Amino acid sequence: MVKAVATVRGDSKISGTVTFEQSEENSPTTITWNITGNDANAERGMHVHQFGDNTNGCTSAGPHFNPHGQTHGAPTDEVRHVGDLGNFKTDAQGNATGSVQDSHIKLIGPLSVIGRTVVVHSGTDDLGKGENEESKKTGNAGTRPACGVIGIAA
């Protein structure tokens, strides 16, 4: 079992943790989040980005992790960036907890997300279904108020 964690924070009040667990290379990865400080009753996009670099804030993380050169999509779409995690929903206090399994996200093997960055976005991800070119790149998910590099967990 490989476990990894990202401690998410940034220039905003948003903070939290995103954990990843994978038992073997061909098994799905369980992604669990506990994020606070968002807008109340909102959906916010979350993605794994290419680089584990936060030297210039979350902007340094680069584009979505996309080793197969696909267009942006929903986590359940076959055609999507590997890093497309979709949206999480916040409660009346702006907090979000949840868990999902994803067969594209890997901790083991050449496409591991360890060392890359999880970004929490300021808007709702349109899952590549928007009517403009940006939708196919970013899902129109907005700015990057919080992020964290994915590291190996104990």
Curated annotation (Swiss-Prot):
<feature type="binding site">
    <location>
        <position position="81"/>
    </location>
    <ligand>
        <name>Zn(2+)</name>
    </ligand>
</feature>
<feature type="binding site">
    <location>
        <position position="84"/>
    </location>
    <ligand>
        <name>Zn(2+)</name>
    </ligand>
</feature>
<dbReference type="GO" id="GO:0031505">
    <property type="term" value="P:fungal-type cell wall organization"/>
</dbReference>
<dbReference type="GO" id="GO:0006825">
    <property type="term" value="P:copper ion transport"/>
</dbReference>
<dbReference type="InterPro" id="IPR024134">
    <property type="entry name" value="SOD_Cu/Zn_/chaperone"/>
</dbReference>
<dbReference type="GO" id="GO:1901856">
    <property type="term" value="P:negative regulation of cellular respiration"/>
</dbReference>
<keyword id="KW-0862">Zinc</keyword>
<keyword id="KW-0479">Metal-binding</keyword>
<feature type="binding site">
    <location>
        <position position="144"/>
    </location>
    <ligand>
        <name>substrate</name>
    </ligand>
</feature>
<dbReference type="Pfam" id="PF00080">
    <property type="entry name" value="Sod_Cu"/>
</dbReference>
<protein>
    <recommendedName>
        <fullName>Superoxide dismutase [Cu-Zn]</fullName>
        <ecNumber>1.15.1.1</ecNumber>
    </recommendedName>
</protein>
<feature type="binding site">
    <location>
        <position position="64"/>
    </location>
    <ligand>
        <name>Zn(2+)</name>
    </ligand>
</feature>
<comment type="subunit">
    <text>Homodimer.</text>
</comment>
<dbReference type="GO" id="GO:0050821">
    <property type="term" value="P:protein stabilization"/>
</dbReference>
<feature type="binding site">
    <location>
        <position position="72"/>
    </location>
    <ligand>
        <name>Zn(2+)</name>
    </ligand>
</feature>
<keyword id="KW-1015">Disulfide bond</keyword>
<feature type="binding site">
    <location>
        <position position="49"/>
    </location>
    <ligand>
        <name>Cu cation</name>
    </ligand>
</feature>
<feature type="binding site">
    <location>
        <position position="47"/>
    </location>
    <ligand>
        <name>Cu cation</name>
    </ligand>
</feature>
<dbReference type="GO" id="GO:1902693">
    <property type="term" value="C:superoxide dismutase complex"/>
</dbReference>
<comment type="function">
    <text>Destroys radicals which are normally produced within the cells and which are toxic to biological systems.</text>
</comment>
<dbReference type="GO" id="GO:0004784">
    <property type="term" value="F:superoxide dismutase activity"/>
</dbReference>
<feature type="binding site">
    <location>
        <position position="64"/>
    </location>
    <ligand>
        <name>Cu cation</name>
    </ligand>
</feature>
<dbReference type="GO" id="GO:0006882">
    <property type="term" value="P:intracellular zinc ion homeostasis"/>
</dbReference>
<dbReference type="GO" id="GO:0045944">
    <property type="term" value="P:positive regulation of transcription by RNA polymerase II"/>
</dbReference>
<keyword id="KW-0049">Antioxidant</keyword>
<feature type="binding site">
    <location>
        <position position="121"/>
    </location>
    <ligand>
        <name>Cu cation</name>
    </ligand>
</feature>
<dbReference type="GO" id="GO:0005829">
    <property type="term" value="C:cytosol"/>
</dbReference>
<keyword id="KW-0560">Oxidoreductase</keyword>
<feature type="region of interest" description="Disordered">
    <location>
        <begin position="124"/>
        <end position="144"/>
    </location>
</feature>
<dbReference type="GO" id="GO:0045454">
    <property type="term" value="P:cell redox homeostasis"/>
</dbReference>
<dbReference type="GO" id="GO:0005634">
    <property type="term" value="C:nucleus"/>
</dbReference>
<dbReference type="GO" id="GO:0006878">
    <property type="term" value="P:intracellular copper ion homeostasis"/>
</dbReference>
<dbReference type="GO" id="GO:0005507">
    <property type="term" value="F:copper ion binding"/>
</dbReference>
<dbReference type="InterPro" id="IPR018152">
    <property type="entry name" value="SOD_Cu/Zn_BS"/>
</dbReference>
<keyword id="KW-0186">Copper</keyword>
<keyword id="KW-0963">Cytoplasm</keyword>
<feature type="disulfide bond">
    <location>
        <begin position="58"/>
        <end position="147"/>
    </location>
</feature>
<dbReference type="GO" id="GO:0016670">
    <property type="term" value="F:oxidoreductase activity, acting on a sulfur group of donors, oxygen as acceptor"/>
</dbReference>
<dbReference type="GO" id="GO:0005758">
    <property type="term" value="C:mitochondrial intermembrane space"/>
</dbReference>
<feature type="compositionally biased region" description="Basic and acidic residues">
    <location>
        <begin position="124"/>
        <end position="137"/>
    </location>
</feature>
<dbReference type="InterPro" id="IPR001424">
    <property type="entry name" value="SOD_Cu_Zn_dom"/>
</dbReference>
<dbReference type="InterPro" id="IPR036423">
    <property type="entry name" value="SOD-like_Cu/Zn_dom_sf"/>
</dbReference>
